[in-house]
Amino acid sequence: MRRVTVKRGLGFLVIFVLLAAGWVVAQQAPQAAVTIYGFTFKPGELTVAPGTEVTWTNKDGPAHTVSATDRSFDSGAVSTDKTFKRKFEKAGTFNYGCQFHPTMTGKVAVK
């Protein structure tokens, strides 16, 4: 009798742990990445769902910025191998560029 109770208790414990792990995974926000290299943003255009966190990583020699043309966000100087993250909550198109290098531009479309 005791053996059945222990097995049943362990079964419930395993199910609880698996459900809890699934809940934690489900709570993570979607993510996307942009690499800064060769004086370009790669990809230059990115489409994401609302709630997505975008990470820009500078793999170039000089520092760059990730600055919205509408001034809604600005990374400041991002040095080599450093990152800038922004979570996009609302739908819209967000154009951005590098303040140090005006030919560097990109776009995040949130749909």
Spell out what each predicted region is.
Residues 2-111:
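Extracytoplasmic copper-binding redox domains, predominantly the cupredoxin/blue-copper superfamily
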